[in-house]
């Protein structure tokens, strides 16, 4: 879990877009390996995609 102070700091809008924090939008708040399109970290993305809870996403098979 992310610290409460970091979550509050993340809500402030930065002067430049690249200075913003990317944290997992799910409950974990992980700061690394965040997919911006889905606002999820790779771990949460994998769990939700395997359960079929993200529309249009499925596991690749070839």
Swiss-Prot record:
Cofactor stoichiometry and binding? Answer: Binds 1 zinc ion per subunit.
Query: Which cofactor(s) does the record list?
Result: Zn(2+)
Which residues does the record give as Zn(2+) binding sites?
A: 24, 28, 41, 44
Q: Where are the transmembrane segments?
A: none
Q: Which SUPFAM superfamilies match?
A: Glucocorticoid receptor-like (DNA-binding domain)
Q: Which GO terms label this protein's molecular function in UniProt?
A: metal ion binding; rRNA binding; structural constituent of ribosome
Q: Subunit structure, briefly?
A: Part of the 30S ribosomal subunit. Contacts proteins S3 and S10.
Instruction: Give the family per the record.
Output: Belongs to the universal ribosomal protein uS14 family. Zinc-binding uS14 subfamily.
Q: What is this protein called?
A: Small ribosomal subunit protein uS14
Please tell me the species this chain comes from.
Spiroplasma kunkelii
Q: Encoded by which gene?
A: rpsZ
């Amino acid at each position: 879990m992310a610290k409460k102070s970091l979550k509050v700091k993340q809500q402030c809008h930065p002067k430049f877009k690249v200075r913003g924090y990317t944290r997992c939008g799910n409950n974990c708040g992980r700061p690394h390996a965040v997919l911006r399109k889905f606002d999820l970290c790779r771990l949460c993305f994998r769990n939700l995609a395997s359960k079929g809870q993200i529309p249009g996403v499925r596991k690749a098979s070839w």
